[in-house]
Amino acid sequence: MSIKSDRWIKRMAEQHAMIEPFEPGQIKHDAAGQRIVSFGTSSYGYDVRCSREFKVFTNINSTIVDPKHFDPGSFVDIESDVCIIPPNSFALARTVEYFRIPRDTLVVCLGKSTYARCGIIVNVTPLEPEWEGHVTLEFSNTTPLPARIYANEGVAQMLFFQSDEVCETSYKDRGGKYQGQTGVTLPRT
């Protein structure tokens, strides 16, 4: 299994719609020329953006967090260019980009150092072979202060690993519960 380069990522995005919308370069400034957290194709990965759609966790109902019986009322929905995450809390978002993962490829997501150095951790499970959809992102604010996330700017890097053998059973074959997700998706069992 080897990590794939910018050339492979560009080819797969342009010829097979692996990433939509796709940015072949690295964007570091907005339309007004202001610096932003970069996004787009890097040497061996793709830096994704989060959309303006957020779900911020609040425990106003004093519920127990249970992945089998998750209470959607534990979140406040926000649509904004900026999301403020309360201290020691978390928020969910989704990528701007829609992914279609090839059958012989596994994608691993890592947070961007710009956020990590501020105590904001991004968590995403691997994108499995033949999974497709918008990626649901989880941002943990590990600090005792409110933390800010910017929509339409880079938040995480996707690394693409291509196997030397095609898997016997893909995520699509298994009927994965998050196949084709398009919004911020809460836990499913």
Curated annotation (Swiss-Prot):
Catalyzes the deamination of dCTP to dUTP. Keywords: Hydrolase, Nucleotide metabolism, Nucleotide-binding. GO terms for biological process: dUMP biosynthetic process; dUTP biosynthetic process; nucleobase-containing small molecule interconversion. CDD domains: trimeric_dUTPase. DCTP binds at K112, S113, T114, Y115, A116, R117, T136, L137, E138, Q157, Y171, Q181. It holds the Pfam family DCD. InterPro entries: dCTP_deaminase, dUTPase-like_sf, dUTPase_trimeric. The keyword 4Fe-4S does not apply. Homotrimer. The keyword Hydrolase applies. It comes from the Bacteria. GO terms for molecular function: dCTP deaminase activity; nucleotide binding. It is an enzyme of class 3 (hydrolase). The active site is at E138 (proton donor/acceptor). NCBIfam families: dCTP_deam (TIGR02274). This is dCTP deaminase. Pathway: Pyrimidine metabolism; dUMP biosynthesis; dUMP from dCTP (dUTP route): step 1/2. Belongs to the dCTP deaminase family. PANTHER family: DCTP DEAMINASE. It catalyses: dCTP + H2O + H(+) = dUTP + NH4(+). Its EC number is 3.5.4.13.
